[in-house]
Design a protein with these regions (language model features):
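Extracellular (secreted or membrane-anchored) zinc-dependent metallopeptidases
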Residues: 2-167
Length: 167
């Protein structure tokens, strides 16, 4: 977490309760409640915390964007030695355009990717919406409501989790 700050990554949680009070970064608050990634305050924003969950060992895509900007265009780019890896980025297809669904309707997002070097791929589906600070259990339609999970090998994700839908 503190290393992320050294690379210009800000907090990504959206709660302003408990230990999160006064620490929310409104321009990077993409995670509901206390958040669940490295730059979150997982478990510290009572009552909006993920119970028993420590910060994941992965960054939210917004943190990744900030770190890449710092190391390629910011002051973190003042003295690098660039070493080409030869690795090709994957070609990703998460669908074109958008779609509408009725409110409170579970949905599944499919995706696919190919990688020219034959590397195995993992997938992370992340909500990328900023909004007002607030509680995840009383959504107002203008803030993130879906938490980030660690990347997996399956190229689909159901929102909310299927276990939450059937319970």
């Amino acid at each position: 977490h503190e290393m992320g700050h050294q690379f210009d990554a800000e907090h990504t949680f959206n709660s302003d309760n408990g230990g999160c009070s006064g620490n929310r970064s409104s321009n990077t608050a993409y995670e509901p409640g206390s958040g669940s990634t490295i730059m979150s305050y997982a478990g510290l924003c009572s009552p909006n915390s993920y119970a028993g969950y420590a910060s994941g060992r992965f960054y939210h895509v917004k943190s990744f964007e900030q770190i890449v900007t710092y190391t390629t265009a910011g002051s973190g780019n003042s003295c690098p030695t660039i070493t080409p890896t030869g690795n090709q980025p994957p070609i990703v297809d998460a669908g074109a355009g958008g779609f509408s669904i009725p409110i409170s309707t579970p949905f599944t997002l499919p995706g696919s990717a190919t990688e020219a070097d034959g590397d195995s791929l993992i997938y992370s589906w992340e909500q990328y919406d900023l909004g007002n600070a607030g509680d995840w259990d009383s959504p107002s339609g203008d803030a993130p409501i879906f938490r980030v999970f660690p990347p997996v090998g399956e190229p689909t994700r159901t929102f909310p989790q299927i276990s939450d839908v059937v319970n």
